From Swiss-Prot:
Residues 553-624 are annotated as: C. This is Chaperone protein HtpG. GO terms for molecular function: ATP binding; ATP hydrolysis activity; ATP-dependent protein folding chaperone; unfolded protein binding. PROSITE patterns: HSP90. Belongs to the heat shock protein 90 family. It comes from the Bacteria. Residues 1-336 are annotated as: A. The gene is htpG. Keywords: ATP-binding, Chaperone, Cytoplasm, Nucleotide-binding, Stress response. Pfam families: HATPase_c_3, HSP90.
Amino acid sequence: MKGQETRGFQSEVKQLLHLMIHSLYSNKEIFLRELISNASDAADKLRFRALSNPDLYEGDGELRVRVSFDKDKRTLTIADNGVGMNRDEVIDHLGTIAKSGTKSFLESMGSDQAKDSQLIGQFGVGFYSAFIVADKVTVRTRAAGDKPENGVFWESAGEGEYTVADITKNDRGTEITLHLREGEDEFLDDWRVRSIISKYSDHIALPVEIEKREEKDGETVISWEKINKAQALWTRNKSEIKDDEYNEFYKHIAHDFTDPLTWSHNRVEGKQEYTSLLYIPSQAPWDLWNRDHKHGLKLYVQRVFIMDDAEQFMPNYLRFVRGLIDSNDLPLNVSREILQDSTVTRNLRSALTKRVLQMLEKLAKDDAEKYQTFWKQFGLVLKEGPAEDHANQEAIAKLLRFASTHTDSSAQTVSLEDYVSRMKEGQEKIYYITADSYAAAKNSPHLELLRKKGIEVLLLSDRIDEWMMNYLTEFDGKAFQSVAKADESIEKLADEVDENAKEAEKALEPFVERVKTLLGDRVKEVRLTHRLTDTPAIVTTDADEMSTQMAKLFAAAGQSVPEVKYIFELNPDHVLVKRTADTEDEAQFKEWVELLLDQALFAERGTLEDPNQFIRRMNQLLVS
């Protein structure tokens, strides 16, 4: 063949092929869904390009995909008359994987076949799924608008290399022939192939036809029979659509193997006319946190496909939402640049955002278990919402879930509505603490007084929490209050002490002055506190001071961190504080004060500037 050359697969392709064949074999029939889905995409792309260049149809505007098989040759062929590919596109699409993060994704694969199967499904195997059932795959293709002699031949046994060559192909589009492995004869059975196509492809708008052979007058007559509904699912009446159809359509557009958690299908008429079909996946995509992760909705205008991954219709904190929007108000020649500045886009974004938040609120109300699944997968992303979307902050806040002293569990199951319903009489604020871990939050000395008073505290231990709480300032008219910061409401609780305690506290004023003199400007203030029960001392920050957790976030991001000036608070009822106050020897007094401060700093920050000095001091005082 003219222009023939043999090329090696990109190393990631070889690895993916091996993993896929072994991980997906139990669900091998999906190869047909994937190949028909690709054909549907090729038809969508041709329709879009033909809007500005109708000649691309080459006189054949009836788009379809045809499936045929040859029992003697043991081949199955899927052919479309969509946009097709030129030689460079064949090499790019069939010889390499252009997705960023592919290498790290493949390295994450392990020996758990069920988990690997889900991960590969999320990754989107597309064309390569043909090798699950075929030991050789042949592709013949020609790009729409190219001359017949610019056709391309591609063939591979999926073992490290492929052959590409130039051919003459009179009709545009792509024809994929699978040379089936031994034992895969079920895919040469007419009834079996029909049932798979009906199962997976009823929802797509592209007609799927199967070859029909009949004997007439001693001759074989070939005709094509359409076997799917070939009506875009979102254009149908909701009452006519079964859950299975919604699930299969999700898998088609999301390239996912698992059913979604929930969906919302709506047709809106009036000032704006559009149809939306929005899905919440049941698991996070493998590249959710990748900077180059593509997200957004499929965009159709008047049922004509325009683009994938139109991120302009969803805020970033809802980037996990999959689905489509079909608008009657946007122009057919719309571009990403036009979308960015369009009033129609902004209005649609606002409406769709509210729709998703309502869908999540309904899921949380109707099925707490499913909502927990959602929260575990996407809670960290949703926590970006309060900072990004002030207009919907209250709705987002209702969807947040936290660990709490009420449940005594690290599971984030407590809603803010739950918390408010349990607030004590006279309690005006929602108390929370941020820490590096659930254990650090749960065992923080800042909680001692509130525990004693039976006041619930939210335990926040995700890295994003401190940043989120800078924007989430109130809920249901109740202000949020970090228990690690100085605050009147906490001091008010702490000041509920008897007269004898006040007298004892007055007697300790000279001790407080000694500590202030010793520490100087290393701390912002030294004072006695009654907010502690078991701990001798803590450090807190002023309301306007940067918190410890925020300082850690700045440091982790490589930014300069201003020095945090702490308030050093001492528990006058604790034996170590009393012993320190009674110590007259200045050197010994200094050692005790430094130990108490180091303990408080260690509890607050989880680290010390000089841990060896801390250990030396503690050992020395233990034996003295």
